[in-house]
Amino acid sequence: MTDINLKPNQRIRQIVGISTMLVIGAMHGFRIGQFLKGDLYKLYYSFASDLVLPIGAYFLLSMNEIHVRFLRKWYIKAIIVFAAMTFSEIMQAFDIYFFGVTFDFLDIVMFGIGILFAILIDKLVLESLVPHWKYSK
């Protein structure tokens, strides 16, 4: 397949990846958790980032999968994201901080759930509803 045929695919992947990151950034920037009360407030500040950051990372990798062949399988992207996020969480147990400062096993569970959401969005929603999302490999 020539590059000309892949341009619409690459463009839509860039739009989805960048839009996803902008939504995640806005969610953090506008601090939407401040409008929540009680247990919902605690849950949001404990786990919201653990859910959405893997989704963002998954779609950042999706932006590059046309040109980086090993990223074309959904499970490769999922493994890379889960490994990076889990590594960061485990390092917190040893006082080495990347994405947070307190180790919590539930964060790792939430990473997995976030990645599952990303896969469902990718395979069920985007492949069926977005033109040019699928391409012949």
Where are these regions (language model features)?
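Bulky hydrophobic segments
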Residues: 1-137
